[in-house]
């Protein structure tokens, strides 16, 4: 497998400046970012976990997309966590069409256990850079609402709050996050066999939600499709709840496939799952990825 070169030197000040510029661009943080794509494409990328080649591929094949949304988990687990984070952040700085939604690994709770803190320490940048990373975590939106009816979140719906209007009041600048509702949005998982909400398998404060809870949420909030990431899928994706929910996973650390979702709006509305090629040698670094 080919490793992509990355145009950064290990200079903490440069890296911190990149993160700070994106925080400045985000401005006043909002829990739910709202966008409209009336015609054209929107692309959604699931967990990349340091898969810089997948992130590069996603942007390279999405040059015609009006929106490219990375649905969280840019760091931890993989080989190029810091560079993957910086590449996506730099792309979001350059182009407003690139959006980052927060995942459960954009958190101080996970980085010490799943590799990101160790990577920063091995690069001798942890003390200088990590405070800037944490500040960024707290400014990322928990969800993206597209065209008022398509919701992208990392984990899933929360047992409480159950309305998007209430989601708009979730506290920001919360590095864990400690708010139970925000925590659930990042950590919860869907299951076909569950009635309502049941305690999850990922630890205290996490839940599984079933089709009845999902349908109640979507009907209450006018949502007709939910895009989420968070769970390893051998094929890179899985549809659930009669096709109204899709899980997208965009990393190969689990030895499975990596996939991205393209949606087209307008007279020819459709969805397309794109499986990322297994051989990185088939991927060229985009000269102008955004």
Annotate each PLM feature:
Residues 1-290:
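Feature recognizes metal-dependent phosphohydrolase scaffolds
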């Amino acid at each position: 497998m080919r490793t992509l070169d990355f145009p950064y030197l290990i200079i903490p000040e440069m890296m911190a400046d990149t993160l700070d510029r994106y925080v400045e661009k985000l401005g006043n943080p909002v829990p739910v970012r709202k966008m409209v794509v009336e015609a054209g494409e929107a692309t959604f990328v699931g967990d990349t976990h340091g898969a810089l080649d997948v992130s590069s591929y996603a942007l390279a094949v999405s040059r015609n997309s009006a929106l490219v949304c990375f649905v969280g988990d840019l760091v931890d687990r993989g080989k190029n966590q810091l560079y993957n984070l910086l590449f996506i952040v730099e792309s979001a700085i350059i182009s407003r069409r690139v959006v980052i939604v927060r995942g459960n690994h954009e958190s101080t709770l996970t980085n010490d256990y799943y590799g990101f803190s160790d990577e920063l320490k091995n690069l001798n940048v942890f003390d200088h850079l990590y405070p800037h990373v944490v500040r960024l975590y707290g400014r990322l939106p928990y969800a993206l609402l597209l065209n008022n009816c398509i919701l992208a979140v990392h984990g899933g719906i929360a047992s409480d709050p159950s309305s998007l209007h209430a989601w708009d009041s979730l506290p920001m600048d919360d590095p864990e996050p400690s708010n139970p509702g925000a925590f659930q949005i990042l950590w919860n998982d869907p299951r076909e066999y569950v009635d309502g909400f049941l305690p999850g398998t990922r630890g205290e404060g996490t839940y599984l939600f079933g089709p009845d809870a999902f349908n109640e949420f979507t009907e209450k909030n006018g949502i007709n499709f939910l895009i989420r990431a968070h769970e390893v899928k051998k094929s890179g994706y899985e549809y659930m709840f009669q096709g109204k929910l899709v899980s997208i996973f965009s990393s190969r650390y689990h030895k499975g496939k990596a996939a991205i979702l393209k949606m087209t709006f307008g007279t020819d509305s459709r969805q397309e799952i794109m499986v990322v090629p297994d051989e990185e040698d088939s991927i060229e670094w985009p000269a102008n990825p955004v």
